Regions:
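N-terminal membrane topogenesis motif
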Residues: 1-23, 79, 83-86, 218-241, ...
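Signature of the first transmembrane helix
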Residues: 5-66, 100, 130-131, 237-255
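Interfacial/gating helices of multi-pass transporter permease domains
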Residues: 32-52, 180-186, 225-230, 253-282, ...
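Helix-loop junctions and terminal segments of transmembrane helices
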Residues: 59-74, 282-306
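Short membrane-interface helical motifs at transmembrane helix boundaries
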Residues: 98-121, 327
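Membrane-interface junctions at transmembrane-helix termini in multi-pass inner-membrane proteins
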Residues: 134-156
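Hydrophobic alpha-helical transmembrane segments
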Residues: 156-170, 178-208
Length: 327
């Protein structure tokens, strides 16, 4: 990957990330005035559950696909890259479908026994329906990132945020017009609709690419083994991080209650911290996360071509830039 292409991809993803986060900042202000800090707290309680499920079913496969597609494309093995994409997407969709059914069916257990908040049961059920759509969207993103085409992931990121904000505002207006209580359900519904829109957009774009959807897959078992060999350690890593984050989500409100806060006050304080303060603190990470996403396929390409000196150089340069940016 040329420097120009790398910086262009990083610029596109960074711009999309900045626009999305700015919109998200005002979106959280809107939520704070509509569902309140307690509603944001309930919403923030169930969001890590989605991250945990996607960590188990999709994130590892997504990263593996980006790396494999880039490697096969660099070696001129276009069909191999497309076969990996199709099998990986089907595998992620299958796993996320099982997870969605399980969590939807046992939503009362997760709400009462895990999150210790019975009010989150309906939120968990609706959120569970979004898992397969999120898997499709993430896998299609990995396909385009593997081809080093950052424009599609950047565009869908903005589309997803726009749909989330618009649909939540629309549901809020509907609730007001019909005298229905405004709860955290409108935020979860907005999240579900945004994932649905991103998945539909991804499906349309892939359907227009006839080479991806028409040919026969050769050696599917070998492809599954190749994807699994790379995705398994990545999945375990993301799963461990998600489990730790989920434990934090459960413990913080409980500890706040232990120190004298009421359940409502604990949720409100937790909502202010995770829904409003923390996103502002993590705002600068947009640049580094965009660079890391673009680096994955480019390093995979250089490794496939045997350019190990370039890998060491780009690793040192990137680490230095991130340290300077963080300081």
């Amino acid at each position: 990957m040329s420097k120009e292409r790398f910086f262009k991809g990083t610029f596109l993803l960074t711009s999309a990330g900045l626009i999305s986060r700015i919109m998200g900042f005002f979106y959280r202000i809107f939520l704070s005035h509509t569902i309140g800090a307690e509603g944001i707290g309930l919403y923030q309680l169930v969001v890590p559950l989605q991250h945990l499920v996607l960590a188990m079913t999709t994130f590892g496969i997504q990263t593996a696909l980006s790396r494999l597609i880039s490697s096969h494309t660099a070696l001129g093995e276009k069909k191999e890259a497309q076969d990996c994409f199709r099998i990986g997407t089907f595998l992620a969709l299958f796993l996320s479908g099982i997870a969605a059914w399980s969590i939807f069916t046992f939503s009362d257990f997760f709400a009462v026994q895990i999150l210790k908040e019975p009010a989150t049961e309906s939120l968990i059920r609706l959120l569970a329906l979004s898992f397969p759509f999120a898997s499709v969207h993430l896998c299609v993103n990995s396909y385009y990132l593997g081809l080093k085409k950052a424009s599609f992931p950047a565009a869908t990121q903005i589309l997803e945020q726009l749909v989330r904000i618009f649909s939540t505002c629309l549901l809020w207006q509907i609730c007001l017009s019909r005298n229905i209580a405004v709860t955290a359900m409108i935020a979860v519904a907005g999240s579900f609709l945004s994932e649905l829109a991103a998945a539909l957009c991804s499906f349309i774009c892939i359907s227009l690419n006839s080479s991806v959807s028409s040919h026969h897959i050769e050696k599917p078992v070998q492809k599954i083994s190749e994807i699994g060999h790379m995705a398994l350690p990545l999945t375990l890593n993301r799963l461990l991080l998600s489990v730790l984050a989920a434990i934090e989500v459960v413990l913080i409100p409980q500890c706040l209650r232990m120190y004298g806060l009421s359940p409502s006050e604990a949720l409100s304080l937790y909502g202010v911290f995770t829904g409003m303060a923390l996103p502002c603190i993590l705002f600068p990470s947009t640049v580094t996360s965009s660079a890391s996403v673009i680096l994955m396929p480019s390093v995979a390409e250089m490794q496939a071509l045997g350019h190990h000196k370039k890998i060491r150089y780009i690793t040192r340069t990137t680490c230095t830039a991130c340290i300077l940016l963080g300081s």
